[in-house]
């Protein structure tokens, strides 16, 4: 029944699938087996929770995996279109800003790492710009088309694993 349901979903509109099993962060064999089944049905992108997040919290890992399944195909199409606009192989020369503020090669960029890439880019850009004036304590205000981010910097980056955005 599950395989028939997956075929119906895939034939209607979905080409991407998220697979989240409760204990896959410690034992991923079943997710790998499910991936083989889903790919055989014809899904073009399969996001596995054990790959998207190593945390034990099932719901958070599931949220991350679903976001990756939704966003990665869109990003992949964008990257393919971008490559097609250039002559020659430029794949090693294009990098994308990730949510953690780091850069990654376009071939490694994933949907889950793109969610906060804009705000991260604003922070990194502000810090680099302030360094030109030798300022090490700054408050940043980054207003874009869909969000506004306010942040501070006191000479070193702060990292967090747990955060809330808009109450979530």
Residue ranges and their predicted role:
Residues 1-168:
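N-terminally biased helix-coil "hinge/interface" segments that flank
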